[in-house]
Amino acid sequence: MKPRISVLTLGVADLEQSLAFYRDGLGLPTKGIVGREFEHGAVAFFELSGGMKLAIWAQDDLVHDTGLAKTPISPTSFTVGHNVARREEVDAVMAQARRAGAEIVKAPQDTFYGGYAGYFRDPNGHLWEVVWNPANIPADA
């Protein structure tokens, strides 16, 4: 399989609340919610680096589309990593997330690999790691 992963979709309880968190709170660029004209089609896409997109889609619509049973979000089954270019950016992003309504799970601290990182949960419980790793500085930094 040639890797062509281009969109990561998070199931959310409230699409409007999640849009506000990511767009207004974290400042992620988006055109807002699209697809409202389709039953179960409303979704928002956020532009990330390298052409990657983050999507938020109502969990009930994701359940409808897949046919799977709805389950609670498990913050320990998947994390979204946000790598930053400088150590102090970890603190800044974590503070921004807290102001936007995130729950700080683990305050930023030194890591075993020589980096600096912290964790927060978005309003839906999705776990994010904000990390500075001196051995893995983002190319677009």
Task: List each language-model region with its residue ranges.
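Vicinal oxygen chelate
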Residues: 1, 4-14, 44-48, 67-141
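Short hydrophobic-acidic sequence motifs that mark active-site Asp/Glu residues
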Residues: 53-55, 79, 127
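Short, charged, solvent-exposed linker or helix-capping segments at domain edges/interfaces
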Residues: 57, 66-68, 130, 140-141
